[in-house]
UniProtKB/Swiss-Prot annotation:
Disulfide bonds join 261-264, 650-651. May act as a carrier of hyaluronan in serum or as a binding protein between hyaluronan and other matrix protein, including those on cell surfaces in tissues to regulate the localization, synthesis and degradation of hyaluronan which are essential to cells undergoing biological processes. It comes from Homo sapiens. This is Inter-alpha-trypsin inhibitor heavy chain H2. Residues 1-18 form the signal peptide. InterPro entries: ITI_HC_C (IPR010600), ITIH (IPR050934), VIT (IPR013694), VWF_A (IPR002035), vWFA_dom_sf (IPR036465). PANTHER family: INTER-ALPHA-TRYPSIN INHIBITOR HEAVY CHAIN FAMILY MEMBER, INTER-ALPHA-TRYPSIN INHIBITOR HEAVY CHAIN H2. It is found in: Secreted. The modification Aspartate 1-(chondroitin 4-sulfate)-ester is found at residue 702.
Length: 946
């Protein structure tokens, strides 16, 4: 049966010597009005064990009816999600208002992979509490004092992504029972959102039915949605209150609303309450949250170009796949093939006792080839046995050969997706040998994903097979929904965005870090890393992430302070201040369980087992190695709930099974290279321990150009007064293929009759690399051919693409280097958002040591070939603090004024005063021609010289 009833009441005259507590009358929390509301027209209050009469019109005999045997007085669910860590409590209160003993069943569905942390039960005032014990200890305790008339246990359900916790208690007339179960789980991001499911199946009407879900996310909520999962019956019942970082979902139907029809006694509450949400992401380096000696790092970058993939579909077409399973698989594969991108390469292998391939090598996913592959799949006729070993080795051979021959894009990712519904029956039958063969032949750049269809397949084998080869396994339930399950899984891995993702926390006081090295990152998902630290030794935690995108090597940095969350969590009574510890424990235990299944020796397995057991006991959670012992205060009545055999792969619901690397093993290419302008440090570090070069050519403010002439050792300044929207060429070097242009933005309004202009956007074009970089006051975007990569000013990161490297320091500076011989620095100037006049703007700094060609020109580029100047006849000016002088340059004699300008490289707020000689009239006479000669039509246009 697909959905089980949460409360099943079976009535029989029991002669079992159970745990019976005689009381008189009904429980104090059930009154006559409650019963009338739950079953109108059915009840009259009578003494215990008596009957009541009701005369029916036209009938002389009496009809005797009994009071409803069991009343569900209260059914409450409270669930709190704090930074993806969900803690849920399910509580029900039941009263036996029958004159006979009744068996009361508490049967609730919880997500697979959730850890039960507590269970308690009160039977007419006598409380049973739970404790976590090692399985053998728990069974021994249970054997000593078995509770009569009571059972408890965890049951693996055949339904999708759920299991059942079931307790059965025999209670006497009038007795009340309260059940309360607590469990915890991590919310994994899939296809762009987190999904929180609460299974509501009370089985009958409840006087008080209340569900409350609190979502608390420090990152901020991007959206929150409660879909209709009850076919419109409870339209308008869920109430959603959403703020910037917190939301509350309330579901409290009245008894009348619960009824499946106006006069029915059956409940319509039979299904799932689902909450979908996602969080805001401002930083590419993710969200690093630190609290109470633990940290959690959430990483889910977007706005990245997909990495091309080489994908082999290996499909079981043995006789056991006949019928619905094959039909659904074919339907799913047709959709999946249509979703392949033009830059992808693919092939299809189908196998029974024989191995067939649609193509013996990888083929581009053109429309023609996809159509041909779909026709091939449609003709498949399942029959015969199952030769998994040869099928996987054939797939591995195709990918290995293509890679060895250089046929694969070096920036692509390679995937094998195996779909099978049974164990091998032909060829190699020993599962450990198949696992060994795959491991010995597969190259390290290949990820193997296994989809086990139905329950005849050895799912534990598929888990080991995939976890050992950079993938995961997932069970596909063989029913009418098989096609959508297959398509949903493919969608999760269809968009690889990063390769070789590694998290580093460079400090010795950071310990016990969970898996921090991942083969791939797929769009719409999220990687989560957690660890411990010593608060006495650290007041902040630094993270450095290295990864490779479609065409770029990345270094992403972030920093978190110890007290960042203290104020936020203290202001919300529902926030879980222990979420970092729980999340770390959840990840660690799940990863240890996966490692245990792959342990190469018995000694290693025993060591891992001891670690899992100790953590299970320390954190009070039920795992496959522990039992839930439920006992009364006297200790003479006990129940036992064992977890079922482990079914989910690592971190149930997670898309990644990674590995661990030492904390300081950052790739050599990730170490930021020194630049001649500014040292790129982590956010929060002190800026510029070493002094930047004192002399650069720069543009700041309105826009003020400061040109340093090394031979003369003079700074010459000029302004450009132009219109917003105009694009000025700063450097144009057609021989080197380098362009630097700047687009002007205007102030909000004129000041003293003059509208100031600033650089609001800068464009850099490196022609030989086909790389364009656009820097605005909001984003930094790198384009290479048809691919793009964006960062925001809130990131601290380093991006390397061929000869070009971009370093971003959060809210301060972007440094661009070319072959480590040429550099440009762009400073960000933020102003108060409500300032009546000023706007955010950019400043650019270019060292005169940059090796441009002699043909370089532009407002700055022309001075790479230093002109001769002669400054003489210095004299007092109209302003006593600004003397005047004459300057001969380029055959012209100019009147110049000495003053001060600002260099903001070492002090972004106040700047450092720099003495310079100012050329009036927009640099006329000092620059070649007129400033309007330097207008260009596009942000990446070369300057056309007359």
């Amino acid at each position: 049966m697909k959905r089980l009833t949460c409360f099943f009441i079976c009535f029989f005259l029991s002669e079992v010597s159970g745990f019976e507590i005689p009381i008189n009358g009904l429980s104090e929390f059930v009154d006559y009005e409650d019963l009338v509301e739950l079953a109108p027209g059915k009840f009259q209050l009578v003494a215990e064990n008596r009957r009541y009469q009701r005369s029916l019109p036209g009938e002389s005999e009496e009809m005797m009816e009994e009071v409803d045997q069991v009343t569900l007085y209260s059914y409450k669910v409270q669930s709190t999600i704090t930074s993806r860590m969900a803690t849920t409590m399910i509580q029900s209160k039941v009263v036996n208002n029958s004159p006979q003993p009744q068996n009361v069943v508490f049967d609730v569905q919880i997500p697979k992979g959730a850890f039960i942390s507590n269970f308690s039960m009160t039977v007419d005032g006598k409380t049973f509490r739970s404790s976590i014990k090692e399985k053998t200890v728990g069974r021994a305790l249970y054997a000593q004092a078995r509770a009569k008339g009571k059972t408890a246990g965890l049951v693996r359900s055949s339904a999708l992504d759920m299991e059942n916790f079931r307790t059965e208690v025999n209670v006497l007339p009038g007795a009340k029972v309260q059940f309360e179960l607590h469990y915890q789980e991590v919310k994994w991001r899939k296809l762009g959102s987190y999904e929180h499911r609460i299974y509501l199946q009370p089985g009958r009407l409840a006087k008080h039915l209340e569900v409350d879900v609190w979502v608390i996310e420090p990152q901020g909520l991007r959206f929150l949605h409660v879909p209709d999962t009850f076919e419109g019956h409870f339209d308008g019942v869920p109430v959603i209150s959403k703020g910037q970082q917190k939301a509350h979902v309330s579901f409290k139907p009245t008894v009348a609303q619960q009824r499946i029809c106006p006069n029915c006694r059956e409940t319509a509450v039979d299904g799932e309450l689902v909450v979908l949400y996602d969080v805001k992401r401002e930083e590419k380096a993710g969200e690093l949250e630190v609290f109470n000696g633990y940290f959690v790092h959430f990483f889910a970058p977007d706005n990245l170009d997909p990495i091309p993939k080489n994908i082999l579909f290996v499909i079981d077409v043995s006789g056991s796949m006949w019928g619905v399973k094959m039909k659904q698989t074919v339907e799913a594969m047709k959709t999946i093939l249509d979703d392949l991108r033009a830059e992808d390469h693919f092939s299809v292998i189908d196998f029974n006792q024989n191995i067939r391939t649609w193509r013996n090598d990888l083929i581009s996913a053109t429309k023609t080839q996809v159509a041909d592959a779909k026709r091939y799949i449609e003709k498949i006729q399942p029959s015969g046995g199952t030769n998994i070993n040869e099928a996987l080795l054939r797939a591995i051979f195709i990918l290995n050969e293509a890679n060895n021959l250089g046929l694969l894009d070096p920036n692509s990712v390679s995937l094998i997706i195996l779909v099978s519904d049974g164990d091998p029956t032909v060829g190699e039958l020993k599962l450990s040998k198949i696992q060994k063969n795959v491991k010995e032949n597969i190259q390290d750049n290949i990820s193997l994903f296994s989809l086990g269809m139905g329950f005849d397949v050895d799912y534990d084998f598929l888990k080991r097979l995939s976890n050992e080869n950079h993938g995961i396994a997932q069970r596909i339930y063989g029913n009418q929904d098989t096609s959508s399950q297959l398509k949903k899984f493919y969608n999760q891995v269809s968009t690889p965005l990063l390769r070789n993702v590694q998290f580093n926390y460079p400090h010795t006081s950071v310990t016990d870090v969970t898996q921090n090295n991942f083969h791939n990152y797929f769009g719409g998902s999220e990687i989560v890393v957690a660890g411990k630290f010593d608060p006495a030794k650290l007041d902040q935690i630094e993270s450095v992430i290295t990864a490779t995108s479609a065409n770029t090597q990345l270094v992403l940095e972030t920093l978190a302070q110890m007290d960042d969350l203290q104020d936020f969590l203290s202001k919300d009574k529902h926030a879980d201040p222990d979420f970092t510890r729980k999340l770390w424990a959840y990840l660690t235990i799940n990863q240890l369980l996966a490692e245990r299944s792959l342990a190469p020796t018995a000694a290693a397995k025993r060591r891992i087992t001891r670690s899992i057991l100790q953590m299970s006991l320390d954190h009070h959670i039920v795992t496959p190695l522990t039992s839930l012992v439920i006992e009364n205060e006297a200790g003479d009545e006990r129940m036992l709930a064992d977890a079922p055999p482990q079914d989910p792969s690592c971190c149930s619901g997670a898309l990644y099974y990674g590995s661990k690397v030492v904390p300081d093993s950052t790739p050599s290419w990730a170490n930021p290279s020194p630049t001649p302008v500014i040292s790129m440090l982590a956010q929060g570090s002190q800026v510029l321990e070493s002094t930047p070069p004192p002399h650069v050519m720069r543009v700041e403010n309105d826009p003020h150009f400061i040109i340093y002439l090394p031979k003369s050792q003079k700074n010459i300044c000029f302004n450009i007064d132009s219109e917003p929207g105009k694009i000025l060429n700063l450097v144009s070097d057609p021989e080197s293929g380098i362009v630097v242009n700047g687009q002007l933005v205007g102030a909000k309004k004129p000041n003293n009759g003059k509208l100031s202009t600033y650089f609001g956007k800068l464009g850099f074009y490196f022609q030989s690399e086909d790389i364009k970089i656009e820097i605005s006051t909001e984003t930094i975007t790198l384009s290479h051919g048809s691919s793009t990569f964006s960062l925001s000013w809130s990131d601290t990161a380093q991006v390397t693409n061929q000869r070009v490297q971009i370093s971003v320091k959060k809210e301060k500076v972007v440094t661009i280097t070319l072959d480590k011989e040429m550099s440009f620095s762009v400073l960000l100037h933020r102003v108060w958002k409500k300032h009546p006049v000023n706007v955010d703007f950019l400043g650019i700094y270019i060292p005169p040591t940059n090796k441009f060609s002699p043909k370089a020109h532009g407002l700055i580029g022309q001075f790479m070939q230093e002109p001769k100047i002669h400054i003489f006849n210095e004299r007092p000016g109209k302003d006593p603090e600004k003397p005047e002088a004459s300057m001969e340059v380029k055959g012209q004699k100019l009147i110049i004024t000495r003053g001060l300008q600002k260099d903001y490289r070492t002090d972004l707020v106040f700047g450092t005063d720099v003495t310079c000689w100012f050329v009036h009239n927009s640099g006329k006479g000092f620059i070649d021609g007129h400033y309007k000669d330097y207008f260009v039509p596009q942000l990446y246009s070369f300057l056309k010289r007359p």
